[in-house]
Structures are given as structure tokens and as C-alpha cells.
Amino acid sequence: MYKDIDSHQRDSRTDGHQDGFKKNPNFRFFKKKTCRFCDMDRVPDYKEFDFLKKFVTEQGKILPRRITGTSAKHQRRLALEVKKARYMALLPFVKKY
């Protein structure tokens, strides 16, 4: 009545791997990003608008921590300094098309 199936064929969820996860051939190990401000012992300043441009997109949005790699402390300070630079007209609020 029932077919005789060995245990390897029965458990198709593991896909032949013992840990139960499929191995992704496209997976790459990424180097953990380090905070530029911690590395250089520097504090974000609104007067250095050329340096602040690296943390702002073309549309004028502040890039998040997960992309820039800044620490939480410096990201908060960076956001304040970008806003100061915008208020002083050193950085644009939005890019004009």
C-alpha cells in the first residue's frame, strides 16, 4: 500500500544539506563598515559641507547608518550638522531638476 521511500528522499526540506538551510552560491561576505568619524577622530561640522555631501543623496536625503557605517552617536550628530548646513544654505534641501 505504501511505497518504500528512504529517509533522504522523504525529507525534501533539507535539500540534501544536514543543517537544513540551502546554500546560496551568490552569497558574499561583506566587510563590516566602520565609522569614518571614529577612525579619523573627528566630529561632524556644518562648515565642512564638502565632507557632509558624502552622507547625503543626490535628492538631498541623509543616508542611513546601515549604508554609511557611521556609529549611532555620530549619525545623530551628522543629521544635526546637515540640517545646520541646509539652514545656512551650504547644502541644498532638495536637488533642483
From Swiss-Prot:
<comment type="function">
    <text>Binds as a heterodimer with protein bS6 to the central domain of the 16S rRNA, where it helps stabilize the platform of the 30S subunit.</text>
</comment>
<protein>
    <recommendedName>
        <fullName>Small ribosomal subunit protein bS18</fullName>
    </recommendedName>
</protein>
<dbReference type="Pfam" id="PF01084">
    <property type="entry name" value="Ribosomal_S18"/>
</dbReference>
<feature type="region of interest" description="Disordered">
    <location>
        <begin position="1"/>
        <end position="25"/>
    </location>
</feature>
<dbReference type="GO" id="GO:0022627">
    <property type="term" value="C:cytosolic small ribosomal subunit"/>
</dbReference>
<dbReference type="GO" id="GO:0003735">
    <property type="term" value="F:structural constituent of ribosome"/>
</dbReference>
<dbReference type="InterPro" id="IPR036870">
    <property type="entry name" value="Ribosomal_bS18_sf"/>
</dbReference>
<feature type="compositionally biased region" description="Basic and acidic residues">
    <location>
        <begin position="1"/>
        <end position="22"/>
    </location>
</feature>
<keyword id="KW-0694">RNA-binding</keyword>
<dbReference type="GO" id="GO:0070181">
    <property type="term" value="F:small ribosomal subunit rRNA binding"/>
</dbReference>
<keyword id="KW-0687">Ribonucleoprotein</keyword>
<dbReference type="GO" id="GO:0006412">
    <property type="term" value="P:translation"/>
</dbReference>
<keyword id="KW-0689">Ribosomal protein</keyword>
<keyword id="KW-0699">rRNA-binding</keyword>
<comment type="similarity">
    <text>Belongs to the bacterial ribosomal protein bS18 family.</text>
</comment>
<comment type="subunit">
    <text>Part of the 30S ribosomal subunit. Forms a tight heterodimer with protein bS6.</text>
</comment>
<dbReference type="InterPro" id="IPR001648">
    <property type="entry name" value="Ribosomal_bS18"/>
</dbReference>
<dbReference type="InterPro" id="IPR018275">
    <property type="entry name" value="Ribosomal_bS18_CS"/>
</dbReference>
